[in-house]
Amino acid sequence: MTTESIFITTLPMDFNSQFDNITIGLNDNETLCENWREIHHLVFHLANTCFAAGLVIPSTLNLHMLFLRGMLCLGCTFFIIWAVLFRCALDIMIWNATFLSINFMHFVYLVYKKRPIKIKKELKGIYHRMFEPLHVSPELFNRLTGQFCEIKTLAKGQTYAVEDKTSVDDRLSILLKGIMKVSYRGHFLHTISANAYIDSPEFRSTEMNRGETFQVTITADDNCVFLCWSRERLTYFLESEPFLYEIFKYLIGKDITTKLYSLNDPTLGKKRKLDTQPSLCSQLSVMEMRNSLASTNDNEDGLQNFLRGTSTTSSQRNKQQEFYNAYGVGPLSHAVFC
């Protein structure tokens, strides 16, 4: 028995007649397709043109999503007009009204996200100098500075921290305006200029060990304005924002490096900047240097020799290495912060 005979025996008795009807129907349809209907109204073609224009907008365009949603909304609107005025098709109108509502809500959301975000006048400097080059958005910056920090002032001569008295656990600050000077036992160490952390060495070195005090005195050398975070609340916030956490690690590390090199040449804090600044290992910071000074009684000669410095980079490094060897802090590493 052939395959064809098996197939015929398994079919119902009236299948052949139904199949003939279907064949005839298909032939009729093929004949009818020769009579094309007239072209739809211009509104129909405008709708499809809007859809096509929205889809071909390049994704590299900054506002391509806004243009896409706008063209989809316009296309749906034309389809609704066409369905109501020229086709009287309720289903086409309902579907396109639904699509129009969805796309319009998305369009409004995108416009809201693109709105210009205002940054406080006092904070624009540190945003443009420190955070914007690292691709921190204004919205994220406002979250960082708007919840658990405040802007404070210090008059000339007032102290931000006093050695052996002020706790390092309470705050972290960035100087917005003015100049501060850092001294140890009456000896000037370096200055802190605007757009720099005030207590970054203490913040880094006491992340694991709390309850310590400043080993230096920080005094306002001018009328100063600074941004002050609550350290505990800032730590909790950064734990929920991994991107900002890495930004803070980088900025604090860079600030510590700048402070370290300004110990040999105080003019670095005001007039000069190092193009390529080698850094310390993560365990080595200015705070450890300060603690090493505090733990040594006979350190006046070493401090004076260290602060004297020389004009060349190689001699600066030699002086620093001698200083660290003398006070038992450990070898100096010249790895670069990433």
From Swiss-Prot:
Glycosylation sites: 21, 29
Primary localisation category: membrane
Keyword field contains Cell membrane: yes
Keyword Membrane annotated: yes
Organism superkingdom: Eukaryota
Stretches of the chain found on the membrane's Extracellular side: 1-40, 87-91
Bilayer topology term: Multi-pass membrane protein
GO process terms (BP): epithelial cell-cell adhesion; heart development; positive regulation of locomotion; positive regulation of receptor recycling; regulation of cell shape; regulation of cell-cell adhesion involved in gastrulation; regulation of GTPase activity; regulation of membrane potential
Region annotation Disordered: where it falls in the sequence: 296-317
Transmembrane segments: 41-61, 66-86, 92-112
Tissue specificity field: Expressed in the heart.
Biased composition (Polar residues): 307-317
Pfam families (UniProt xref): POPDC1-3 (PF04831)
SUPFAM superfamilies: cAMP-binding domain-like (SSF51206)
GO cellular component: bicellular tight junction; lateral plasma membrane; membrane; plasma membrane; sarcolemma
Topological domain spans for side Cytoplasmic: 62-65, 113-338
Compartments, record wording: Lateral cell membrane; Cell junction, Tight junction; Membrane
Keywords: Cell adhesion, Cell junction, Cell membrane, Developmental protein, Glycoprotein, Membrane, Tight junction, Transmembrane, Transmembrane helix
GO molecular function, one term: structural molecule activity
Function of the molecule: Cell adhesion molecule involved in the establishment and/or maintenance of cell integrity. Plays a role in vamp3-mediated vesicular transport and recycling of different receptor molecules. May be involved in the formation and regulation of the tight junction (TJ) paracellular permeability barrier in epithelial cells. May induce primordial adhesive contact and aggregation of epithelial cells in a Ca(2+)-independent manner. May be involved in epithelial movement during corneal sheet formation and regeneration.
Family: Belongs to the popeye family.
PANTHER family cross-referenced by the UniProt entry: BLOOD VESSEL EPICARDIAL SUBSTANCE (PTHR12101:SF17), POPEYE DOMAIN CONTAINING PROTEIN (PTHR12101)
Annotated protein name in UniProt: Popeye domain-containing protein 1-A
Organism expressing this protein natively: Xenopus laevis (African clawed frog)
